[in-house]
Amino acid sequence: MDLHLSREQEMLRKMYRDFAENEVKPLAEWVDENEAFPEETVKKMAKLGMMGIYFPKEYGGAGADVLSYVMAVEEMSKVCGTTGVIISAHTSLCCAPIYENGTEEQKKYYLPKLCSGEWIGAFGLTEPGAGTDAQGQQTTAVLDEKGENWICLLYTSDAADDMQ
């Protein structure tokens, strides 16, 4: 087993590290103190392919490997935990389930928008009693009378205003 990084992985790690030091670290304290979402930083990460690192190019991803994704999360997390979690949740909790379990139609519809950063993935664990147990949630959705729209009773905040 070869435990060395490839030349491409070394270059990506340097790019991630430089980006983290130059773009993420200077804002990290402000992000934490203000409980802010670093929207401009996320846009820059998307332009560098960091919002879809290991997904195939045919779905808008960068076409790199999982180790490259892990290195990006690691480098961002070294300087700003929030930014590391943004990449991690977006990729692992939103994009990956679509890529691994979605239909071809779903992959072609959702992944390009997610990998480009046009949409940012999220994952909610908000039910009383569910805590961090995603399987413990009880929320259900039912089709409306016309069979066209799903109805789900939930509480939302301004954070969901831009969600599709």
Residue ranges of predicted features:
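Conserved small/polar residues in nucleotide/adenosyl-binding loops
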Residues: 155-160
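Short strand-connecting beta-turns/loops that link adjacent beta-strands
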Residues: 145-147
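A structural signal for short hydrophobic beta-strand segments in well-ordered beta-sheet cores
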Residues: 139-142
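N-terminal glycine-rich flavin-associated loop
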Residues: 85-105, 131-134
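Amphipathic, small/basic residue-rich leader segments at the start of a protein or domain
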Residues: 1-88, 105-116, 120
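Hydrophobic, small-residue-rich alpha-helical packing segments that form membrane-like cores
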Residues: 133, 149-150
